[in-house]
Amino acid sequence: MIEKSSSSALGTNILLVIFIFFQKTSSPSTERKPEVIVSTFSQYDIVKHLCSDEISFKMLIPFGQDIHSFEPTPKDMISISKSALFIYSGAGLEPWIKGTYLAKNTLDLSQSVHLHVLEESCNHDHEEHHHHEENEFDPHYWLDIDNMMSSALSIKNELLKIKEIKKEKLEQNYLNYITSLNELKIKYEQTLKSCANPILVLNHNAFSYIAADYNFTIESISGLSSDAMPSAKTLVHINEVVKEHNVSTI
């Protein structure tokens, strides 16, 4: 009887060990991936191409929402504080950031790119440097492909600090991404410089970097702010430009 009980107990223990072993080896990992939060799509695109498999990442400002007027919710701020990295454009594009406490794990991309001084700031003494006053610069710098390359480098260097990310894979993805940007730059040079009409009439002036690179002239209805109301004088001027230069599309 005692031998029978011992055999039964031994069998139960063996089954328990086998069960635990398979639970550990066959169950999917419940470890959470490090989270990276970005403010706009240009950063989202870079992160997606560099290491989307190894991290959880999301764009803070929803598609279709005006970047300039966006305000984060308390839930958004909690997510930012808990993230492994928060990336934002800077240069005044996200006004809510000014005066907001941000943890050390943040990256202001405007500090590593070439910025255009706004026309109304041109009469101020200005020097290219890393610490600048916001709102003196056009914040739409990612439309310059060279700036996208600089942004990709800065983001890659920050991602390398996250221990869960495979460094060699990240470096290779970065090189692939830079190659694709160079190819896009060549296409731009081949097509945009040969445009017959160099006048761009826009509702919202977000294309000054492209205009500078490829010799376009920008005529903007609402300036840098997409929700600004144009004056009657501006509308008359735009109408004259459209007629004079045979602009077919605004």
Regions inferred by a protein language model and the residue ranges of each:
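N-terminal secretory signal peptides that target proteins for export/translocation
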Residues: M1-E3
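Extracytoplasmic metal-acquisition and chelation regions
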Residues: S5-A9, N13-L16, F21-T249
